Amino acid sequence: MHDWDPALYQRFESEHTRPAVELLARVSHPAPRHIVDLGCGNGNSTQLLLERFPQSQLIGLDNSEAMLASARKRLPGVPFVQADIADWAPTVAPDLIFANASLQWVAGHAGLFARLMRCLAPGGVLAVQMPDNLDQPSHQLMRELASQSAWRDQLAHAADQRAALLSVEAYYDLLAPMACRVDIWHTAYRHVMPSVQAIVEWLESTGLKPFLDPLPAVLRDAYLQAYTQRIGEAYTKRADGHRLFAFPRLFIVAQRAP
């Protein structure tokens, strides 16, 4: 994929940040010394961590240089590092690994989650939030359009960028043998959106990227036009003219055994 667009992402920063706030609220570690914001993006979640734990040694990690530039501008006193979560290893065992809306882009969750738990210091916490929306109309329509003849050749592998999440039970079974506490919950947000275009713009900054980036301009515009029409049919107007955009998310907080 092409690099992320911080300006587009920031148009919906309050909606993107809300799950991070709710995830952090369930982290009970009293005083983590070393914290890693894994997949920190533009630093919105890093800022929450800094405000909650101002005495901690905090580092933000992401693979997008554009997002990291935005994060450094937001929090010039925090070190931000460009790295890939898939092969990242800490130099010091963290007391808290915070991964808000990042691990869904990394393959092989069985191995990934076990590795992250092993990276933690004894008693450390792994806090994860992941979109669980591949079966929502927003993402079903991406795949349906990608299978049509106009875009099939260019988008043959677009859907491979993200695999479906494991079941809640599978995540629990992965984490429980290494943890003294596992907290898992699922939330389906209903974001009140002013228009169809607002929904599409939100998705352009996230889930649509693997489907738009491979396309030349003419095909990209045609895909977006067809997608926007179908989104309007899937997310109909409510009584006040707004549209409810359903967005399920999975939350996990696991504390490594001391």
UniProtKB/Swiss-Prot annotation:
| Protein localization | Cytoplasm
Q: InterPro entries given for it?
A: Methyltransf_25, SAM-dependent_MTases_sf, Trans-aconitate_MeTrfase, Trans_acon_MeTrfase_C
Q: Which EC class does it fall in?
A: transferase
User: What GO MF annotations does this protein's record show?
Assistant: trans-aconitate 2-methyltransferase activity
Q: Does the keyword Repeat apply?
A: no
Q: Which GO terms describe its cellular component?
A: cytoplasm
Q: Which domain of life is it from?
A: Bacteria
Keywords, A to Z? Cytoplasm, Methyltransferase, S-adenosyl-L-methionine, Transferase
Known catalytic reactions? trans-aconitate + S-adenosyl-L-methionine = (E)-3-(methoxycarbonyl)pent-2-enedioate + S-adenosyl-L-homocysteine
The yes or no answer to whether the keyword S-adenosyl-L-methionine is present is: yes
E.C. number(s) listed in UniProt: 2.1.1.144
One Pfam entry for this protein is: Methyltransf_25
**Main localisation, per the record?**
cytoplasm
Q: What GO terms in the biological process aspect are recorded for it? A: methylation
Q: Output the HAMAP family linked to this UniProt entry.
A: Tran_acon_Me_trans
| Biological function | Catalyzes the S-adenosylmethionine monomethyl esterification of trans-aconitate.
PANTHER family xrefs: TRANS-ACONITATE 2-METHYLTRANSFERASE, TRANS-ACONITATE 2-METHYLTRANSFERASE-RELATED
Protein family per UniProt: Belongs to the methyltransferase superfamily. Tam family.
Can you name this protein?
Trans-aconitate 2-methyltransferase
Species this chain originates from: Acidovorax sp. (strain JS42)
